[in-house]
């Protein structure tokens, strides 16, 4: 339930951009539009989603990567027009909504297990009586 004026809700809903679903622990590649003078190019930022904030038009997420041995975090607005695309590389199996503890970890202790795809249920074949 939202306590916003109905007209504000209509305008905000028109601004929403369709994005793929992802969660904390997932490795994503965010293609960001970068303006350099007259030119505009795409810059890829690949890392692990350590936080996600779902607030409609104000939704945001934080991506962390290690670049030259230094941890780099970047926060993005989910529905921002500067984001060209978001691609989910792998799904991570985590048990927390915010993965801020990864900031203190490095190397193998900072790894995240991969979420396995659900298996098809086994079909039990009835034995044929001969």
UniProtKB/Swiss-Prot annotation:
Any Pfam family hit: Ribosomal_L19
UniProt name for this protein: Large ribosomal subunit protein bL19
Organism annotation: Psychrobacter arcticus (strain DSM 17307 / VKM B-2377 / 273-4)
Keywords: Ribonucleoprotein, Ribosomal protein
NCBIfam families: rplS_bact
Recorded GO CC terms: cytosolic large ribosomal subunit
UniProt GO molecular function: structural constituent of ribosome
Cysteine pairings via disulfide bonds: none
Function: This protein is located at the 30S-50S ribosomal subunit interface and may play a role in the structure and function of the aminoacyl-tRNA binding site.
SUPFAM superfamilies registered for this protein in UniProt: Translation proteins SH3-like domain
PROSITE patterns given in the database record: RIBOSOMAL_L19
Protein family according to the UniProt entry: Belongs to the bacterial ribosomal protein bL19 family.
Residue runs in coiled coils: none
InterPro entries per the UniProt record, alphabetical: Ribosomal_bL19 (IPR001857), Ribosomal_bL19_CS (IPR018257), Ribosomal_bL19_sf (IPR038657), Translation_prot_SH3-like_sf (IPR008991)
Listed GO biological process terms: translation
